[in-house]
Amino acid sequence: MEDKESIAQAADILRRGGLLAIPTETVYGLGADGLDETAVLHIFEAKGRPQDNPLILHIPDASWLTRYCEDVPDAAYKLAERFWPGPLTMILKKKPCVPLRTTGGLETVGMRCPDHAVTRAIIEASGVPVAAPSANTSGRPSCTTAEHVREDMWGKIDGIVDGGPCQVGVESTIIDLTVTPPQLLRPGGLPLESLRDALGEVTVDKAVTQKMNDGEKPRAPGMKYRHYAPKAPVTVVTGGAKASARYLLTHAGEKSGIICFDEFAQLFDGHIVHPLGASDDKRAQAQHVFDALRTFDETSVGEIWAQCPDSKGLGLAIGNRLKKAAGFHVEDADDGKIVIGITGGTGAGKTSLLRALERKGACVLDCDAVYHEMLKDDELLLRALREAFGDVIFRQDGSVDVHAIGLIVFKDRKKLAELDAIVHERIPRALAQKMAATNAEIIGLDAIKLIESGLGAICDATVAVTAPEEVRVKRIMARDSITEEYARSRIAAQKDADYFRAQCDYEFVNDLPTAEKAEHAAEVYINTIINNLKEETER
């Protein structure tokens, strides 16, 4: 919609007192003439928005500030020069021409210049400041696409300008410049660090991290009321990414919806999952957070569990939106535990590292042993195995015949892949529950398929144990009393050392001639890893 005629038509809707959904870089806004009290009232009615929740005025550039604001401080122009157009709203003293209905009864007004050329052109053509809260039903997740706007506003407004998906994905940052020092009222698309870099001291209002008290008057949008909420209740889990993923595995129910970082999505097979973005990609998380919350309204999930990024950069805004969606129902996953995953092919010598962990007081979990334990009474696992392989894998007493499963899967790669998928869906939760139950500060995971199962993602460190093939052959022959030919065939059937080396954080080459030397080297190696992890945590 970049042609002059379309822009003129959109501007005319605003001048006539109509409601127009407009795109910005943050979220879609529900726009109206901010000086027209009747038009502003229609915004509140269309959204079902509380009357004391102030609106933001959108302008095409900083030269419009003095039209609507008194005593504009130098800091406002400094911020405008540096960050406008962009995701920043400044709270300033309003002039009498700005209705109290627009400001929620306040003598201040939020001013913003959006970073969307079409929307700025529409505002310029209309000749009026455009009051534009997010174009969603009040309380629901904000709209980041025109389709989201249609879902909430169809039949209630006069038009939608489709500008494609929003590039930032969370609303603007709001800073109050009427107080000294300036105060952050709402985190958003411009990080707090950027404001402090420009102005020096900037304080943070308590409403950013906790619920406002009843009776308190909000000084800016997004401060007081439950916002961004899907229909199902939300629980937000804070803490390190790996720790919070383990927490979700332990606590989320079988039918819970999951919002998680990309690298953990595989662990929640069987759930309805909406990946938020990689744990280190907050720009992607900001773009996806509202879409993630909205997605679950199309499902039957009874609850939603969400991982939360740290508060650095855009993380403060993303976490704020998630916590408000949850009504500040937040649980902290950081338990101080260190999880080290040990993997490698048969005969590589994993036992040396596992024993070193045990000597450090670690709880060592053998994934294969946990799987066999689950075969006794995990009803969902047993049902899935019966559906996949039939009654032939069950003995007369109802127990699982592991040998019978082996006869099927080792002759048929598709069946082996099917078995892996079933086990990998069930075992992460069982292991996470055992991790949560132990009092040990260090946990070791022993798993040949640590990477393929997704379990490596929840380990604070992963170690590939490797050894030359000739060494492995001799170890397997001695350990299992098998022929050289059979030992080599077993090695050939597994991933090679290059695979494990590429997938893990560390490599321990266990080619030492005696068990005593191997265990001494392993102990030194484990101590190094643990010290490295503790130093990373302290940083």
What are these regions (language model features)?
Residues 1-334:
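Active-site-adjacent structural elements in enzyme catalytic cores
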Residues 3, 8, 433-442, 456-465, ...:
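NTP-dependent small-molecule kinase module
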Residues 340-342:
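Hydrophobic anchor at the beta1->P-loop junction of P-loop NTPases
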Residues 345:
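P-loop (Walker A) phosphate-binding loop of NTP-binding proteins
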Residues 348:
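ATP-binding Walker
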Residues 351:
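Walker A/P-loop
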Residues 358-367, 380:
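Post-Walker A helix-loop "phosphate-sensing" segment adjacent to the P-loop in P-loop NTPases
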Residues 372-439:
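ATP-dependent small-molecule kinase phosphotransfer cores
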